[in-house]
């Protein structure tokens, strides 16, 4: 994984033979064909990932990228910037929404300081290059060199955690004002008008959404990101957390392991990751349909259909934490259900 190009090249297609064998296995379970719907297709998808030798006893972890954004200074958020640092402390203590939901699904949470504008947090893993990204309304979020460095560092973190036993990754984020750069990324990479993408984020009043949209337009106009080059887009109108999430997605794919997406921020990262390495889409598992305005446009571009519709927009990886239970259910179905051939039951073949 010495370069982003090498990282992308390490992502292999799913194993077609394993998928065919898994499909036969699922069709032979004690149930009518396709009666467990998308649980069946999820189990088959997981079976085709070369990094998973088996689907039982999977160890799950959500990596949460925490960072601040210079564009906060443009008045695009109502929550104080210090809340990023405060919530990162709470996350490190296991008190935030993602931590509670992850515990419920037997999933660990790994917060990472990838650019918080604050003092180091005790015992928190750090990949930080600086305290917050640049203000995208005035110039680039970071240099291309820094973006590539953090993509590779985040992917290397995934590889390390995989070697330590993690077999299912989730991705999350924490950063006040980060829906602004996410909206810019989605607007550029999906060729969408910002009006169709920019939403309220963390409860921005409706009368300020137009200003936020104007800031996204300004960021795109000033930085002129190249829509054919996702790394350029991340560096110019993204942020450290978004780059880190993209690296986690690419890293999981390079390890042949699944990565469960979260909401709006993760859609932006996934769109970037899929442009860098189209094969990585096969390793992405959608979780929930974010309530953020641009969610539908982003998901349509990705061609992914979320499992969960709960009007959530917390972020942090909270949707990924919920979806981990669905991943576990698909694996339990695959590994623990009996086979029709041994049951004495004969079912009609569907027309």
Regions found by a protein language model. Give the residues of each.
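N-terminal loops that bind phosphate or other acidic moieties
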Residues: 1-351
């Amino acid at each position: 994984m010495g370069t982003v190009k090498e990282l992308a090249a390490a992502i292999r297609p799913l194993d077609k033979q394993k998928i065919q064998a898994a499909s036969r296995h699922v069709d032979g379970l004690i149930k009518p064909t396709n009666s467990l719907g998308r649980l069946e297709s999820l189990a088959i998808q997981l079976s085709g990932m070369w990094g998973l030798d088996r689907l039982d006893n999977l160890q799950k972890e959500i990596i949460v990228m925490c960072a601040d954004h210079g564009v906060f200074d443009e008045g695009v958020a109502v929550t104080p910037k210090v809340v990023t640092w405060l919530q990162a402390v709470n996350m490190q203590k296991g008190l935030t929404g993602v931590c509670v939901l992850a515990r419920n699904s037997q999933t660990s949470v790994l917060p990472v300081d990838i650019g918080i504008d604050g003092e180091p947090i005790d015992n928190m893993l750090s990949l930080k290059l600086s305290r917050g990204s640049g203000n995208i309304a005035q110039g680039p979020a970071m240099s291309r060199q820094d973006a590539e460095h953090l993509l590779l560092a985040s992917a290397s973190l995934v590889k390390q955690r995989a070697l330590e036993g993690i077999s299912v990754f989730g991705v999350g984020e924490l950063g006040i004002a980060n829906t602004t750069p996410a909206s810019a990324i989605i607007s550029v990479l999906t060729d969408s008008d910002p009006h169709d993408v920019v939403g309220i984020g963390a409860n921005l009043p409706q009368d300020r959404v137009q200003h936020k949209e104007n800031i996204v337009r300004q960021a795109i106009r000033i930085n002129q990101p190249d829509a054919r080059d996702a790394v350029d887009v991340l560096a110019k109108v993204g942020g450290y957390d978004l780059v880190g999430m993209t690296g986690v997605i690419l890293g999981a794919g390079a390890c042949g392991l699944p990565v469960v997406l979260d909401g709006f921020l993760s859609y932006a990262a996934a769109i970037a990751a899929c442009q860098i390495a189209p094969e990585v889409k096969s390793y992405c598992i959608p979780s929930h349909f974010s309530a953020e305005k641009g969610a539908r446009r982003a998901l349509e571009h990705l061609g992914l259909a979320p499992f969960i519709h709960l009007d959530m927009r917390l972020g942090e990886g909270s949707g990924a934490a919920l979806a981990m239970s669905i991943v576990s259910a698909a694996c339990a179905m695959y590994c623990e259900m009996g086979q029709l051939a041994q049951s004495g039951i004969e079912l009609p073949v569907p027309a």
